[in-house]
């Protein structure tokens, strides 16, 4: 093992409000990774990776190219909110707005920039049994949100029938993605079904100010 791959002690300090996010050492990358679950997001100003596994959910990867500060979220829209409406008054739209604006706000708190932010999106596969529109609605929302807010999508890999494993490096904007065409178990699907059930009983938070 060379010195660049030795595990540092302790891991780099996370921002205070992300201390509950699971972080661990990835040997073949020589860095720590923050693993986010459905409903979570993570922003870092350290030399860290951010990873997740997506089924129907969406992840937006957002960073400031000049500083290498960035983050990623992992969310889906509530499926029983608004009767299928996809407008700014629906609870589904408000929840998606909340998920996106928290991520963007936190990146901007550290960089002070908005116009130069780089955005990439992933996920939205049709993997939940009997609900083929879930992924499509998530894709529709995130594209519309970014268009309305004036963000261009630098790259995307969305839709299809397979979950995706994502590893994001905010320092250079690279995303390593693997389509999981064969799953050893239903963990990804079960996790998203549980998250969907939680969303159906969760009151949508109020508006978020965008800095």
Swiss-Prot record:
CDD domains: CheD
N-terminal signal peptide: none
Keywords: Chemotaxis, Hydrolase
EC main group: hydrolase
One GO BP: chemotaxis
The reaction(s) this protein catalyses: L-glutaminyl-[protein] + H2O = L-glutamyl-[protein] + NH4(+)
InterPro entries documented for this protein: CheD-like_sf (IPR038592), Chemorcpt_Glu_NH3ase_CheD (IPR005659), Cytotoxic_necrot_fac-like_cat (IPR011324)
Entry EC number(s): 3.5.1.44
HAMAP family with a match to the protein in the record: CheD
Protein's recorded name: Probable chemoreceptor glutamine deamidase CheD
Annotated source species: Hahella chejuensis (strain KCTC 2396)
């Amino acid at each position: 093992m060379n010195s660049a791959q030795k595990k540092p002690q302790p891991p780099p300090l996370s921002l205070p409000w992300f201390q509950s996010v699971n972080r661990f050492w990835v040997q073949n990358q020589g860095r720590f990774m923050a693993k986010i679950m459905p409903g979570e997001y993570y922003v870092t100003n350290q030399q860290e990776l951010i990873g997740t596994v997506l089924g129907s959910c969406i992840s937006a990867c957002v960073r400031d190219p000049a500083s290498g500060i960035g983050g990623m979220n992992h969310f889906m829209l509530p499926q029983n909110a608004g009767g299928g409406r996809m407008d700014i008054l629906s609870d589904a739209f408000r929840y998606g707005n909340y998920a996106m604006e928290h991520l963007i706000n936190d990146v901007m708190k550290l960089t002070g920039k908005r116009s130069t932010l780089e955005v990439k999106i992933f996920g939205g596969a049709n993997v939940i049994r009997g609900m083929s529109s879930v992924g499509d609605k998530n894709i529709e929302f995130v594209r519309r949100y970014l268009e309305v807010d004036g963000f261009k999508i630098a790259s995307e890999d969305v839709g299809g029938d397979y979950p995706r494993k994502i590893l994001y490096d905010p320092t250079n904007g690279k995303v390593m993605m693997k389509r999981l065409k064969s799953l050893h178990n239903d963990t990804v699907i079960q996790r998203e079904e549980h998250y969907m059930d939680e969303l159906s009983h969760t009151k949508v938070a109020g508006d978020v100010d965008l800095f």
